[in-house]
Amino acid sequence: MKKRLDVLLVERGLATSREKAKAMIMAGEVLVDNEREDKAGSMFPEEVEIVLKGKPLPYVSRGGLKLEKAMKNFNLTLDGKVCMDVGASTGGFTDCMLQNGAVKVYSVDVGHGQLDWKLRNDPRVVCMERTNIRYVVTEDIEERPSFVSIDVSFISLTKVLLPVRNLMEENGEIAALIKPQFEAGREKVGKKGVVSDPAVHKEVIEMVISYAKSISFGVRHLEFSPIKGPEGNIEYLVHLVRLPDGVTEEETNVDVDAVVKSAHDTLDK
């Protein structure tokens, strides 16, 4: 009898969930009969030899690797902080926050049943599933977060940043993913929802940055995500700081052109 590769990984105890198994497979960490296999849905006999290579994924999903890069490159410190993970899904960002000292994480997602069981049972995690961040108010949470990550799909960041700002502590920080496929006009999105034109990437990044500045966020850093999105889209990480109401910073020190070029040079090989 044949089974999916991600199912076999979970059954053998090589992965804690199918989502984590998929992340490991996509990261090239799984060898089947000494051959690298990158499709989670590939079917194999139950007795097939499966070997993991390299160091195991440290988070419940590969999303944690995105926040890990943001923390290193943006000099973020989460020790002792209350945080919020918007678009939590399986909880890769939440897991990364906890492993870096967060004392509490509000894990917010419009879906349900996705958050990894380990995190769902962690007393430091408040699972806010079936929850649209656009309608969350301060009365829904016990403390204002001082750090928020945003990883949302099928919606522009410009629809999410203001509701998040209204929940945050003064001087709170954000690490948000800019996803060109959900920011660009429909006519600029290619087959399978892929946006590959660097000029469009630059355009949507500048649009998001301009909007963030208009609602009193300071823009501190910009980097490209270390891994592509599910369909192969390059994504970007932006570091924002909540300024006092009505305060705007005209200048930013981020070089959008350089970051976009570096992203394509690195990830399009």
Task: Locate each region found by the language model.
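Short, glycine-/aromatic-enriched active-site segment of Class I SAM-dependent methyltransferases
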Residues: 180-196
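Conserved SAM-binding loop of SAM-dependent methyltransferases across substrates and taxa
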Residues: 90-101
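A basic, amphipathic helix-loop patch mediating RNA/tRNA/ribosome contacts
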Residues: 1-48, 82-83
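Conserved class I S-adenosyl-L-methionine
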Residues: 79-89
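S-adenosyl-L-methionine
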Residues: 106-159
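Flexible, glycine-/basic-rich loop-and-beta segments that form/coincide
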Residues: 234-269
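Glycine-rich helix-loop-beta junction characteristic of Rossmann-like nucleotide cofactor-binding loops
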Residues: 14, 72-79, 139-142
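A short glycine-rich, Lys/Arg-flanked "PGG" loop and its adjoining helix->strand segment in the class I
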Residues: 158-175
